[in-house]
Amino acid sequence: NDLLIVDGHNSHGTHVAGTVAAVNNNGIGVSGLAGGDAKNGIKGVGLLSCQIFQHNPNDPQKDLGGDGAVAIKWAADNGAVISQNSWGYTYETAEEQAAATIPGHLRDAIDYFIENAGMDKTGKTQVGPMKGGVVIFAAGNDTREHDPIGKYEPVICVGSIAPDFTRAYYSNYGDWVDIAAPGGSSKYSQGDVLSTLPGNSYGYMQ
């Protein structure tokens, strides 16, 4: 029953969704990395949005966490073959984070997704675009050398780089990070990433 606490007021999930899947070449807003090509009738990726956070009545700026493991398993059973996660656990100190390990129920859910995504209920017949799934997690934004989820070997862990192609000042880091991508940086006057926000709007975030 680990408690997830995240900044809930910044619409991070919607922003990431636009970065991944906003429709390309439709003359509207921004273009996603896998948004297809509207002009040429090429369909982009589809998204399954899994809400795992709950409203916190005591602090509207913070959400209470649900169970990300349940969401990952549900996604595998409902057609997803890539699980993109930019959430994680929070720790009061670097020492507490360094001692942390991935919770067993989350590890099991990740393993389940990798093994069963794209397959039928028997696990023997491929029904999706690929046999088995890929699980991606953000490295985290604590400027620390450890993240228990990112360090789990089957996970593809993504760090963040700034506009000058150095590590973003907030990104966690270490040899367990598999790849890095532009994540924005508020330390630069024009360093944040433009993407979608709730309410048919757009905004810059890091």
Descriptions of predicted regions:
Residues 1, 147-206:
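Extracellular S/T/G-rich loop segment that most often corresponds to the catalytic His/Ser-adjacent loop
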Residues 2-112, 159-162:
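Subtilisin-like peptidase catalytic core
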Residues 10, 39-43, 75-78, 127-131, ...:
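Extracellular/periplasmic catalytic domains that process cell-envelope and extracellular macromolecules
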Residues 27-31, 35-40, 112-131, 184-187:
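Alpha-helix termini
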Residues 46, 81, 132-136, 156, ...:
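Proline-centered loop/turn at the N-terminus of a beta-strand
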Residues 48, 114, 134-136, 180, ...:
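Structural detector of well-ordered beta-strand residues that form the stable sheet scaffold
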